[in-house]
Amino acid sequence: MKNILKVFNTTILALIIIIATFSNSANAADSGTLNYEVYKYNTNDTSIANDYFNKPAKYIKKNGKLYVQITVNHSHWITGMSIEGHKENIISKNTAKDERTSEFEVSKLNGKIDGKIDVYIDEKVNGKPFKYDHHYNITYKFNGPTDVAGANAPGKDDKNSASGSDKGSDGTTTGQSESNSSNKDKVENPQTNAGTPAYIYAIPVASLALLIAITLFVRKKSKGNVE
């Protein structure tokens, strides 16, 4: 009887370790970092805004949806951001470094994704007065994994991007649109491959079945010993 209980306890411990290991593996596969660049809208040319985005970004999959967490420097210059029509969800700020980290829902982690950015500057830059107020489209080029996908759909952004140039306080041009884009953003189709492997869900079921079988076996042996 003692040997049976020892085997039973060992089996239970092994099952717990196996389930914990595979759960951690599943979570690890659905989060990580990705490198990216910021392009002028609908081009392969690096945007002047690229330097204000810290790399790499972080990605995470929650409830079947994909999210990226992006950190910007010169945070007080960047008054608003959106990706695929999804407005930023600010998750942390560092006032001392003038940085903030924002989370966006996205349709994929690899390839081009369109976004919008609002910039307002009214201060001295390089010792000279500078005023800039502009809203324009940009394109993110994500270099993340292709095997992590979500059921995300592009959101709706009711803000139309501005075009043309802005005027400074002295009447001179201080900024220009990244691109003469149309009012409608182009969004590539989301990935359709599966996210979490099926075996991740099968392991707990198989473990439970094995546990039930062992329990019935121990009970049967116990009754036999009593009789």
From Swiss-Prot:
Stimuli inducing this protein: Repressed by fur in the presence of iron.
Signal peptide coordinates: 1-28
Biased composition (Low complexity): 161-175
Modified residue annotations for Pentaglycyl murein peptidoglycan amidated threonine: T192
Compartments it resides in: Secreted, Cell wall
Binding-site list for heme: S47, I48, Y132, Y136
Record's GO cellular component terms: extracellular region; peptidoglycan-based cell wall
Keyword terms of this UniProt record: Cell wall, Heme, Iron, Metal-binding, Peptidoglycan-anchor, Secreted, Signal
Pfam families noted in UniProt: NEAT (PF05031)
Membrane topology: Peptidoglycan-anchor
GO molecular function per UniProt: hemoglobin binding; metal ion binding
Region (Disordered): 149-191
CDD domains: NEAT
Propeptide segment residues: 193-227
Entry-linked Gene3D superfamilies: 2.60.40.1850
Annotated ranges, domain NEAT: 29-150
Sequence motif NPQTN sorting signal, location on chain: 189-193
GO biological process: heme transport
Keyword Metal-binding: yes
Note on domains (UniProt): The NEAT domain binds Fe(3+) heme iron. Reduction of the high-spin Fe(3+) heme iron to high-spin Fe(2+) results in loss of the heme from the binding site of the protein due to the absence of a proximal histidine.
Known partners and oligomeric status: Monomer. Interacts with IsdA.
NCBIfam families: IsdC (TIGR03656), srtB_sig_NPQTN (TIGR03068)
Task performed by this protein: Involved in heme (porphyrin) scavenging. Binds hemoglobin and almost exclusively free-base protoporphyrin IX. Probably has a role as the central conduit of the isd heme uptake system, i.e. mediates the transfer of the iron-containing nutrient from IsdABH to the membrane translocation system IsdDEF. Hemin-free IsdC (apo-IsdC) acquires hemin from hemin-containing IsdA (holo-IsdA) probably through the activated holo-IsdA-apo-IsdC complex and due to the higher affinity of apo-IsdC for the cofactor. The reaction is reversible.
Family classification: Belongs to the IsdC family.
PANTHER family hit by this protein: IRON-REGULATED SURFACE DETERMINANT PROTEIN C
Protein name stated in the entry: Iron-regulated surface determinant protein C
